[in-house]
Amino acid sequence: MTRRGRAVRSITVVVAAFALLLAACSGSETYSGSSDLPAPEDTTGSPENPGTIPQGNFLTTPGAAQRAIDAIVRELGPRRVRYVNMYDSYVIFETQDPAKPENIDRYTYRDGRVGDFEPVNVSGQLQEDIEADLFSITEVNWGAIAGLSETFLAQTELEGGTVVLASVERNPPYQPDVRIDMAMNGTRRNASLQAAGDGTLQNIRVY
């Protein structure tokens, strides 16, 4: 074979190899591209899988109060509590230590986690009185908080009104049932709301 013939054959082989390489790269890019697509955002927000729903305002964002309590229960279990004070972005509560029922501890839930506990001094209180104050954190209708806030704001129409607190507790013998007490601060006046533990509205007062 002449030198020219060998050169033409070499060029033909190189071109064919290059074409095969392009085809292979094209195929790999197709598969790689499909696997690199971001997974659909999970916004289910179930108790087992909170998903990616933003925290929101615990007092006014629908579902935010319940998600906060669900997160607390996931960390500590369905504790019995003496009170729960819920603010716009954090929750403070006192709970009985199930391993040592005579001990009451104070916790703060903030930024998606429960912080370390602080021991509560119960000197002078009988164990039976402590037990009478306790209720299960899961027996309250936390899903009603945002709706109560909406009603609270609508019925009071306070100038600059802002719901600042939802406090849940019982106070036997004067208040034997679990109750939700909410507070609103306004520019010129304040207001309060009372509801049953199941979320049933009982009273709104402007003062």
What role is predicted for each listed range?
Residues 1-15:
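Bacterial N-terminal signal peptides that target proteins for export
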Residues 20-24:
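C-terminal motif of bacterial Sec signal peptides marking the signal peptidase cleavage site
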Residues 31-103:
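Extracytoplasmic low-complexity, Pro/Thr/Ser/Ala/Gly-rich segments
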Residues 84-105, 167-186:
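Short glycine/threonine-rich beta-strand-turn micro-motifs
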Residues 115-161:
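Long, charged/polar, surface-exposed segments that mediate recognition or autoinhibition
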Residues 159-207:
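Extracellularly exposed regions in secreted/surface proteins, prominently low-complexity, repeat-rich
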